């Protein structure tokens, strides 16, 4: 039996000890003496969040298929354990072997959202790995970051040896081989990193120098070592049907956020919503073959025993063989008494029919994400959802017995006016109206329940809105009050509930999202002052962050509310995600002109991703130049 | 057909709580391809019930759950199929077919036997066979326990069926009421021994293993404790 890193008295004292003991069904144990590479895969948040992430499951499976590699998992210790580990000087450990992270060859950290940056420092700190990459020697694992936030790695550049830009399936094998070769040759760590920096998609920040203009924008960004590229092109899998997928995902003991089999049906999105980073980063859209998905579904259900399966993609309705796949799942899942959950489905007669078959209509609610209240603003953000489509979907659903609707909007979008904001209330009211028009009195089960939620818009790199000024906290809150007042004025206001997010964290996210290397210092200082779990409202300490930026002499409005020039060099411009800056610029202009751009299935808009020669880009369509 | 399944729980499984063990078994049964019965209705779930929740940190050689199956081959087949799906620390020990009129596992529980060992460095020097015999020989044992509503004081003696110390092994054996009406935590009994001997009690010192869970095969007046699987029979 394995020896646990934590003693019984600690495990009996902390909340949910199952977070730290490993031993889950399908977790992989290997003999450490028979592998060459120990890889610790980290999601820098609590176990239940980290275990729900599909990307890690894919990479965990991929690494453990390599005979020479043992990949283990590590998550952020919750604050209760965090303080015990500090007090008793217990090093952070991996779940499978329970051995210290510092003894590993690699520490891979997936960076899914900006608000986890201090948790990355917590992981390094508890592992006793120096914060700064340049202070590390061969006693430390190679710290490598990936995931969506690696597309602007600059605010955390000092803390990583390498960033992997793009999809993990392609370059890890060459990187591991290079590592083995370098170890054999007795290379220095620096020599290894120089050679790694020459692999496609890999960015080694310490070999790049940034200079700034007087106005604080970037003057130049150049490699300091010869032979390494000035531009890093993202890696991607051209045929995603042909790549590895976990047939035996780890099944946690405790209930996690994603407590089901997850089937990734496609990567990328054809839609091109202008606020959406994923929609640009993961282009072009590539589908997995439906027949192999059917096989995966059965195998994964058999190997895990899960009671539910979910389809994962940015916009499932756009998957070309959705109907066939879903009908197959309904049939086989019914036999197995398995539920199907279908997020990101457009509400139409097909999806309603499916939902009626797989869900309890009385309990479930409909979800629409119009994102903006008026058609004008929906054109600005290129969200191709019209009021007509929403009302049609809602009417169909009401006739089918549904009486709960969730609506998601954003506040603070570029060009937004009070008129657009009132549109949120008016649309909510019209949906309520549609219910009372559709469902006769005697068939009504109480009032229709409409929940409208707004989040605050944060401009992200590699979107057409990367040039847009973000709102201030005061503007955000004013917009939320305007929404609230407008809803109160509606005829059916009693049927509409309004929720809005807290504004401080959105401002913070905005600073980090479009930040540069100069933010490394305040992030480290904020961590040293005790900031961790910033993504968790109860732990987020806005006052500490504000104070820290001031101490570091950083004017945060430079990163948030500033109007960026069209010719400005952005901190992330050295990354080539496929979509060109010229395309994003033309989309930014289209947004300001309230002009809609067609989706990738209707026509090619020459975004630049076609050069990868895969997915939708290889399907003949009209090209709009 | 109702089955009573006995299993053990050791090692790191001590840190998996009762509800998570239930969830674990629901999935294991699916993986093992056992033809379990489901409730009818819109969200069907497995017909499954557990005898007595085991506290966090405790090990066990005598856990039970009842499940209903639509078909079955044999006890060994069932045990092997389910054991093939177990993680380290949890083993299926027996599976017995219950008579149709059997009370469910939880309602059947009358008592449980525990072995209490002591963690290194926390061994109580005062404990001897004689001390424990003297404790158990009392006509009443007044204890105070914390409940949701506050504290209650009661006589534990009627709920404490056996209590003995093994000098050689340095372990205590306890048989206590484990029914839903009169459940006694083993640590409460051990604390009473410490208290009587004016020794400072620390919960953490105890390494507790539930050895067996019993039903009452006798009468109310003349009880006869038998393992919970007693009323079932091997099949196939």
Role assignments for model-derived ranges:
Chain B
Residues 38-69:
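Short, charge-patterned binding micro-sites
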Residues 133-236:
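Core RNA-modification/binding signature centered on pseudouridine synthases
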Residues 77-86, 127-136, 189-190:
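Short amphipathic alpha-helices in soluble, non-transmembrane regions
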Residues 2-8, 113-118:
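Active-site-flanking beta-strand signature of metal-NTP-handling nucleotidyl enzymes
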Residues 71-75, 121-123, 179:
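Helix N-cap motif at beta-to-alpha junctions
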Residues 6-8, 12, 16, 20:
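Extended, well-folded interaction surfaces typified by the phenylalanyl-tRNA synthetase beta subunit core
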Residues 61-115:
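Ordered, amphipathic secondary-structure segments that act as subunit-interaction surfaces
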